[in-house]
Amino acid sequence: MLALIVLCFILFFYIISRRHRGLCYPPGPTPLPIVGNLLSVLWESRKFKCHHLIWQSWSQKYGNLLGLRLGSINVVVVTGIELIREVSNREVFEGRPDGFFYTMRSFGKKLGLVFSDGPTWHRTRRFVLKYLKNFGYNSRFMNVYIGDECEALVQLRLADAGEPILVNQMFHITIVNILWRLVAGKRYDLEDQRLKELCSLVMRLFKLVDMSGGFLNFLPFLRHFVPRLIGFTELQEIHNALHQYLREIIKEHQENLQLGAPKDVIDAFLIDMLESQDDKPTLDDLQVVCLDLLEAGMETVTNTAVFMLLHVVRNEDVQRKLHQEIDDIIGRDRNPLLDDRIRMVYTEAVILETLRISTVASMGIPHMALNDAKLGNYIIPKGTFILLSLYELHHGPHWKDPETFRPERFLTKEGNILQDEWLIPFGIGKRRCIGEGLARSELFMFLTHILQKFHLRIPKNEPLPSTEPIDGLSLSAKQFRIIFEPRKTFKSI
């Protein structure tokens, strides 16, 4: 009798699930009752080490719109420049998923810059951009902020010159300092132990799950039965530690707040909370915005910068050309400036090629359909999570030799930068990453400061570092070491 009841329940769930998907839902592997395609994902993960490769494999079989059912949630994977552009530019697809994994970090609500939508997102984005610009974001002050941190990083590498250095965590505090001067009016020593621990927490967080959200999104009830197995316990511990740190920073600002004289973004937020009558932010808003800036700003740029050094050290001819351009345009007697960027086309091409071949945001940040909507020849139901296959876009046949690191693909015959519309590592449309300008500036300054002063090489008897990424919210490089050798004619700063 019990077996019959269970069977009826499963059948009922399956029928409801099929009805919710609709007859015009994009094709994909057949889902099972309750778990949907999750078991298929687990099976395929034995073959493919990264989730974006699973989606790519299925898309090749089912088409540019891949329809999945993961647990109780519809998920559509979008492949191809035209469909990606359409999803990115249509208002109906501007939503962000409301899965448990995305909201557990923001007090069960859709707050902040990354995972909010609708009026909350528009309000928060407007506030944050206004505050950041007021304190120097995208202004001449960024030359100073980024330059200071690059000089500190160079000095640290000069102190251990000739020694093999694990580079995977090298940029974390540097990146935090650049943004945190605007956000919290604070900078840290590059050897600050507490911030190193917080950076390690963010690294762990980004490796726990891919951008789809995993079992915590699709079968969230499992956290009550096997919390450690599905990563809930570790995620909760990490978020608790990060929120505790942010609460301390905000409390310190509250205690020293001077109305009418904000010193940084947090001060401006707090003053707005006190003085605004309508549509004012809350402490929860502020805390999640700080979390977004800390996590996304740190980990994605760090991973890209590490991949950038990886490709340079693997390709000696690329390193030689970078040294030559730096010597010709900047020389050795002054530090690089952001103003140099417009003339340094080969350096820019190396950055673009890194963003292409090592697309750390392999599926972008998920979108969600705010209403039923037609896409291609199919209907995307309201509430569907939408993943944009950026990694596949950057590794498709358009590039002819996509697995080869070749910066020259971004140079015209005349030696100018070629802007290829197929390269969209920061997304497009209204939900395009607001930190794109800062990220590109940081990558330029990191590369020029380091290559002006050092020749990079792999330690003796160690293999070339692998270009194969580690899966996660942001793809990251496997651990590798570099020796930073001061260039022979380098003059100390």
From Swiss-Prot:
PANTHER family: CYTOCHROME P450 15A1, CYTOCHROME P450 508A4-RELATED. SUPFAM superfamilies: Cytochrome P450. GO terms for molecular function: farnesoate epoxidase activity; heme binding; iron ion binding; oxidoreductase activity, acting on paired donors, with incorporation or reduction of molecular oxygen, NAD(P)H as one donor, and incorporation of one atom of oxygen; steroid hydroxylase activity. The lineage of its organism: Eukaryota, Metazoa, Ecdysozoa, Arthropoda, Hexapoda. It holds the Pfam family p450. One of its GO terms (biological process) is metamorphosis. Disruption phenotype: Larvae undergo precocious metamorphosis in the third (dimolter) or fourth instar (trimolter). It comes from Bombyx mori (Silk moth). The enzyme is specifically found in lepidoptera (moths and butterflies) and is specific for farnesoate. Other insects contain the methyl farnesoate epoxidase, which is specific for methyl farnesoate. This is Farnesoate epoxidase. Residues 1-24 form the signal peptide. GO terms for cellular component: cytoplasm; intracellular membrane-bounded organelle. It catalyses: (2E,6E)-farnesoate + reduced [NADPH--hemoprotein reductase] + O2 = juvenile hormone III carboxylate + oxidized [NADPH--hemoprotein reductase] + H2O + H(+). Belongs to the cytochrome P450 family.
